[in-house]
Structures are given as structure tokens and as C-alpha cells.
Amino acid sequence: MAKDTPNGAATRGRFITFEGGEGAGKSTQIKLLAERLNAGRIRCVLTREPGGSPGAEIIRHMILSGIGSLIGGTEAETLLFAAARDDHVHTVIEPALAQGSWVLCDRFTDSTRAYQGQMGAVAPALLNAMQRVTIGDLKPDLTIILDVPVEIGVKRARLRRGAAEPDRFEAESLEFHRKLREAYRQIAADEPQRCVLIDANAKVKPVAAKVWAAVQKRLLYSKVSAVQHA
């Protein structure tokens, strides 16, 4: 449970984002981390982008189906991502953090930088402007970037969806995914205080152990100790 401050207000929660290419295992690792945190009596909210709120989920369908890219190209699609994020942040993320919950989010602004910035040739000025409008001063306390070789990630994604049609990003070329992987690795190198790059080319449990170690080291060590001795 979230602890209360002396004036009765809940201590603000922590914001953890998970990033990586297709088939990196983000959804699986988020669920496993939530289980560990819940076991330590830390309340969690699991969410995702694009989507995460009713309005943003509608926009998610437009983006992943390819409808968004037909409206006005890459820049118009970036505006759709921004609209979805604005709704998501103000209706889900910020309220949950204010109530003391820890928010675990499958993709956030780094995905915009990687997909729309690196791949779509969207001007950095537009990306920065959209970020200021949609999230203000909100930043993840920790970003886990799951790194996996492209061929393995694409194969995992294909096995996961089965007979379903790939979404517009899954259907991109291997070269697209290679550049995307490098974009994420560069983000991790540029912001080591926020980001932890984890080799996800392994079984689920060893990767989960690395994620848990990163959370303990960066955010949770003193809190876990307090919970264990409560």
C-alpha cells in the first residue's frame, strides 16, 4: 500500500516505462514486475501506449491499423500519438501517481522518439513541442529498455500473433527494425541516469531477475527493506 504523508496525502507513486522493439517481451516483464511489487504491498497500475485510456484506445486502433498514416503522413500521425498521450497522461497516469500507485507503462515518449523521430523523419522541434504540450514536466523515474536481436524479436512477434494480421509496425522491414533497435540503444546511452538497457535475448525468468535488480537499485532498495521489516 502507498504510505501517507503527515498531512494525510498519499506519497506520490513511481513511474516506470518499458521500451524496446517488437517481440522484446515488454508486456510479459511488466506483468512479472507488477507481481513482485504487489507482493511487497505496492499498488500498481499497468497501462500502455498508444492507448491506456478509452479515448487513447480509439486512437491506438487508428494508428496500428494504418488509418492514421493515410490522413496526412508521418507528421499527422505524430499528432495522433500526441492526442492519445495527452488523454492517457491526464486521465490515467497522473491521477494514479498522485494517489500513490506505481505506474508501469508499456511504451512512452521514447517510442515516439524512436519510431516517429528516427524512422519517420519527423522534425525534432515538432516532437519536442508535442512533448511539452502533452506531458509537461512528467518524466519516468526509470525506463527499462529491453534489447533483443531483430530476427529473434520479429520471430517472437510472429509467434505471438499467430494467424492474426501484423499491425503496421510489425509489418515493417527488417532494416526498419534494425534502425529502431539502434535508436533505442542510443537513447539508453544518452540517458544512463534514467534508462537501463537489459539483454532480453534469454528466458523470461533471467530477464525478469535483471529487471527486478534494476528496480531495486534505482528505486526500491530502501522501500523494500522497510516493507520486509514492517
UniProtKB/Swiss-Prot annotation:
GO terms for molecular function: ATP binding; dTMP kinase activity. InterPro entries: P-loop_NTPase, Thymidylate_kin-like_dom, Thymidylate_kin_CS, Thymidylate_kinase. Its EC number is 2.7.4.9. ATP binds at G20, G21, E22, G23, A24, G25, K26, S27. Keywords: ATP-binding, Kinase, Nucleotide biosynthesis, Nucleotide-binding, Transferase. It catalyses: dTMP + ATP = dTDP + ADP. One of its GO terms (cellular component) is cytosol. The keyword Amino-acid biosynthesis does not apply. It is an enzyme of class 2 (transferase). GO terms for biological process: dTDP biosynthetic process; dTTP biosynthetic process; dUDP biosynthetic process. HAMAP family: Thymidylate_kinase (MF_00165). Phosphorylation of dTMP to form dTDP in both de novo and salvage pathways of dTTP synthesis. Belongs to the thymidylate kinase family. This is Thymidylate kinase. The lineage of its organism: Bacteria, Pseudomonadati, Pseudomonadota, Alphaproteobacteria, Hyphomicrobiales.
